[in-house]
UniProtKB/Swiss-Prot annotation:
The keyword Transmembrane applies. Belongs to the Lgt family. GO terms for cellular component: plasma membrane. The chain crosses the membrane at residues 16-36, 55-75, 92-112, 117-137, 172-192, 201-221, 234-254. It comes from Rickettsia bellii (strain OSU 85-389). This is Phosphatidylglycerol--prolipoprotein diacylglyceryl transferase.
């Protein structure tokens, strides 16, 4: 299948341009905010709706600054340091999930310190929400024809306009499905059917573990960034960055369950 060359800019009014990438962030944040509010309503904790409203600004800054700096430092430092003006062109893409995650974690830590809130209580509310943003972000990647997969002979292969005209795995859609929809359903089941909110740290651990597993597996089908290629002959940067998160997720789950047993 040949992918249509879709303009990354949806529309523009004078100097203001609205891109698919920007829209995915806005929609993801709005839907995420709404969903987190519903979780707080059903499962009251130390975190209130007012806390959530105040944290949204922190989260946006963490996502944008962390995501952009993460991509620049981890994936393409030479390009941006040699032409710093490119750093500001976030509408063209170039955001790192791992960088954004670190940005939000730092933002959450600062917010909790200032408001005397428990850090894991907040991240347990955030964790079930993140797959919403991941879903819309990967759909935007697909529309932009970027971050595509490796060459394939499969019937589901797509010829992307900016690639080498070979059929390639639509790995953006794989990620949207597993890291977005499937992970959302797993965490929704955990929250609403298993009441995991009462086990501090469990939602955070489940998110980290399942996201990392899905990312490590899907990276097998995703084309490595051309400026980095493979690391240690077979691993991608995404896989390497996901491994510590996987271990942290498993640690949080075990710690939470052990704490529940001893109570």
């Amino acid at each position: 299948m040949t992918f249509p060359n879709i303009n990354p800019i949806i529309f523009s009014v004078g100097p203001l341009a609205v891109s698919w990438y920007s829209l995915s962030y806005v929609v993801g944040i709005l839907f995420g905010w709404f969903y987190a509010s519903k979780i707080i309503e059903k499962f009251p904790t130390q975190i209130t709706k007012k806390n959530l409203e105040e944290f949204v600004t922190y989260a946006i800054i963490g996502i944008i600054v962390g995501g952009r700096l993460g991509y620049i430092l981890l994936y393409n430092p030479y390009k941006y340091f040699s032409n710093p003006i490119e750093i500001l062109k976030t509408y063209e893409g170039g955001m790192s999930f791992h960088g954004g995650a670190i940005g939000v974690i730092i933002a959450a830590y600062i917010f909790c310190k200032r408001h005397k809130l428990n850090f894991l209580s907040l991240t347990d509310i955030i964790a079930p929400v993140v797959p919403i943003g991941l879903f819309f972000g990967r759909i935007a990647n697909f529309i932009n024809g970027e971050l595509y997969g490796r060459v394939t002979n499969s019937s589901i292969g797509v010829i992307f306009p900016d690639s080498d005209l070979n059929l390639r795995h639509p790995s953006q859609l794989y990620e949207a499905f597993f890291e977005g929809l499937v992970l959302f359903c797993i965490l929704a089941y955990a929250v609403f059917k298993r009441n995991t909110i009462k086990k501090q740290g469990l939602n955070s651990g489940l998110f980290l573990m399942f996201y990392s597993l899905f990312r490590i597996i899907i990276e097998i089908f995703r084309e490595p960034d051309v400026q980095i290629g493979f690391i240690f002959d077979s691993l991608t940067m995404g896989q390497i960055l996901s491994m510590p998160l996987l271990l942290l997720g498993i640690y949080l789950i075990i710690k939470t369950e052990c704490r529940s047993i001893t109570k």
